[in-house]
Structures are given as structure tokens and as C-alpha cells.
């Protein structure tokens, strides 16, 4: 944390302490002179899944529920929906929802590298028979400019977590 501002370092250290207090971290030490924080993630599978990207699925789900509640729109949704196609191909959809019982939207959440999976998502969108605006890849680390560029290049909608609600606003 030595390369961070004092304010940022304090915020990161406080956040790590909260993770430790809430047992997400099995260990956490802050070496003040060196300004180094060291933490060990809990070994519990649900904790590891959360930090492996499940947090973004929960983020997307909670944001979309709040979005539709504010607009008083009927929405049904699920996380980790397993879809089996007629040829018995199995796919898991991170977040899937229906608006007003009719409009399907699929959200795939990516916290790491996603570029090698774009073809997979293009095929999945086609098999689901939904419009590009309704197949959303919510990817951490994307700027609005990058998301717009990728959305223009592929028949998918790319958004950052910060741009997720704005995309929903365009759809609904």
C-alpha cells in the first residue's frame, strides 16, 4: 500500500479488516512500517466462489431487482439457471430474468478474462433466440469506451458494473 495515497491505504486496510471481522479472511496482518497488508482467504467453498466472481452475479441481481422495483415492473429472475438444449448441451446462465412475463434477458458476469469466451456467448445468444441488447456481458475492468467498442463489434451487449443500470434504462 506504500504506493497508494494515505487515504486510499487507510480505506483498503479498513476494508480488509472488515473482511477479516466478517470471516471472509482467515488471517489478516498489516505491517505498518512497510505498509503491506497480508491476508489469507477462508477455505470454505462458498467464500472462495464469492471471491472468484460470484459477487458480481449478486451485484447484477440486486441492481436489476432495485431497478424494476423502482419502476414498479413485474420481473421474475434467477441466478445460476441450468439450461439443457434438445441436443443435451448444458449451459449455466449467471443471471436470467423475464420482464412482464415476456421479455427475456440473460446476464453473464465476468471478473476475469472473457475474450476467449466471446464465441461461446455468441452461440449461446443465438440458441436462446434473444436480441443482442438482451444478452449482457457485465465485465469488470471495462471502460465505457471499451464496452461500446465491443458492443459495436459483436452481437452482444458489453457493460461495466458502473454502466449496468444505464444499459437497463435503455432497454426498459
Residue ranges and their predicted role:
Residues 1-172:
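Intrinsically disordered, low-complexity Ser/Thr/Pro/Gly-rich regulatory segments
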Amino acid at each position: 500500500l506504500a504506493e497508494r495515497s494515505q487515504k486510499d491505504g487507510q480505506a483498503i486496510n479498513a476494508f480488509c479488516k472488515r473482511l477479516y471481522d466478517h470471516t471472509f479472511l482467515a488471517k489478516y496482518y498489516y505491517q505498518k512500517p512497510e505498509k503491506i497488508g497480508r491476508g489469507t482467504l477462508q477455505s470454505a467453498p462458498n467464500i472462495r466462489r464469492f471471491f472468484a466472481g460470484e459477487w458480481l452475479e449478486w451485484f447484477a441481481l440486486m441492481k436489476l431487482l432495485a431497478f424494476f422495483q423502482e419502476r414498479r415492473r413485474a420481473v421474475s429472475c434467477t441466478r445460476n439457471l441450468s439450461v439443457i438444449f434438445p441436443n443435451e448441451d448444458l449451459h449455466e446462465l449467471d443471471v436470467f430474468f423475464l420482464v412482464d412475463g415476456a421479455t427475456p434477458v440473460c446476464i453473464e458476469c465476468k471478473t476475469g478474462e472473457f475474450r476467449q469466451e466471446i464465441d461461446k456467448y455468441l452461440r449461446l445468444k443465438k440458441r436462446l433466440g434473444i436480441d443482442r441488447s438482451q444478452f449482457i456481458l457485465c465485465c469488470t475492468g471495462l471502460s465505457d469506451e471499451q464496452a461500446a467498442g465491443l458492443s459495436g463489434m459483436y452481437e452482444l451487449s458489453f457493460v461495466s458494473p458502473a454502466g449496468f443500470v444505464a444499459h437497463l434504462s435503455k432497454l426498459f
